[in-house]
Amino acid sequence: MWFCIDLGADAFKEAGVLAEKKNRRVLQHILGLNIFKRELIPPCKDPDPYQIQILLKNYILKNVSTVFTYYCQ
């Protein structure tokens, strides 16, 4: 989820509705915060699953720290 947000996912309302249906109140609240930044990560030009796995393995999450900062203030 965090990787998708960092890539620019913007379906927060839809995801919040799904979280509510699954009774995931904390996730629903987090998705409704509207504090996320879109990181302009170059798209993976090679759809090879191995290359995508390498990208995910080495990826540093950006918006997770945003949520922690929000709750720890």
Curated annotation (Swiss-Prot):
One of its GO biological process terms is: taxis
**InterPro entries membership:** ASFV_MGF360 (IPR002595)
Q: Which Pfam families match?
A: ASFV_360 (PF01671)
| Similarity remark | Belongs to the asfivirus DP63R family.
Give the protein's recorded name.
Uncharacterized protein DP63R
Species per Swiss-Prot/TrEMBL record: African swine fever virus (isolate Warthog/Namibia/Wart80/1980) (ASFV)
Q: What is the lineage of its organism?
A: Viruses, Varidnaviria, Bamfordvirae, Nucleocytoviricota, Pokkesviricetes
